[in-house]
Amino acid sequence: MEILLQKVYDQENLSKEEMTMIATEIFEGRLSKTKIAAFLMALKVKGETAEEMAGIAQAMQRVAIQVAFPAGTAMDNCGTGGDKSNSFNISTTSAFVLAAAGIPVAKHGNRSISSRSGSADVCQELGIDINMRPEDMTYLLEKVGIAFLFAPHVHPNMKYVMDVRKELGTPTIFNLIGPLTNPVHLETQLMGIYRRDLLEQTAEVLGQLGRKRAVVLNGAGFMDEASLAGENHYALYENGEVHLYTLRPEDVGLTSYPLEAITGGEAKENAAILRSVLDGEPGAYLDTVLLNAGFGLFANGKVTTVQEGVDLARDLIRSGLAKQKLADLITYQKEVLAK
């Protein structure tokens, strides 16, 4: 093990198998916090490879609590976080739009690591229980079409790195691979990433992990979401191939806004923003969700273009169907908790 750690310290790449070995040591609690911190920072400085990302993702999935759901039907749209944009909870809001389109959404998420409000924080503020049992998550996916999967709850072995990540206060490989480790076997995925240089290789990793179709995007301003502030870069994985594209908000009939226009706050403020979007209140928040939900619908294959996705997302919000998904989730959750 010391030899493998030294390779990383010496800026040498690890094979998938070598990374799996180190990750297993971490997830079984056999590496000290000091060594974990040194390892994570050395990886960050060196730069994470596709092999390393796949290796640690597979190790995480092996020790995860599995959530049963028919293979090949669900999707996720969570991002890496770590873009320091202090935006509102875009992917969480968009998830209700995707669910309203009839797509089962297994929304993987966590508390804030480098922002003021993570998806788990805003979900709690909305009244969503983030500590459901796996069988309850399955029930909600089946009955409502959306469930929140709290990362520390379904990845209990991550307890060995949570304190280290919080103390480091900077994105690490765990930000990059968190969205890759959903305990539901996904068919499609939209994944925002804060590093534009990793678009192509992350899409390749999703293919290695069994996705049939996926979009990995990096927004203007290097957001881990699609942005209205300029050009968005994304990689589409399909049929074993990856293709790179760009898209501006004007390309799909949306108005440009500066990044400051979608600034969020603490969980209470972000929950209010989420509700205002699902109510259809016009402005930068709504248009940002339309763009991101449009990408999600496109990643899923529900539509053939992002433009069609934006149009469908607008209809789903105007009709009240997206707002109803939030209400249904809370209603059926109470039914589960009352058992």
From Swiss-Prot:
Cofactor(s) the protein requires to work: Mg(2+)
Chain positions recorded as anthranilate 1 binding sites: G79, N110
Top-rank taxon: Bacteria
Subunit and partners: Homodimer.
Function: Catalyzes the transfer of the phosphoribosyl group of 5-phosphorylribose-1-pyrophosphate (PRPP) to anthranilate to yield N-(5'-phosphoribosyl)-anthranilate (PRA).
PANTHER family referenced in this protein's UniProt entry, alphabetically: ANTHRANILATE PHOSPHORIBOSYLTRANSFERASE
Protein name (record): Anthranilate phosphoribosyltransferase
Species: Listeria monocytogenes serotype 4b (strain CLIP80459)
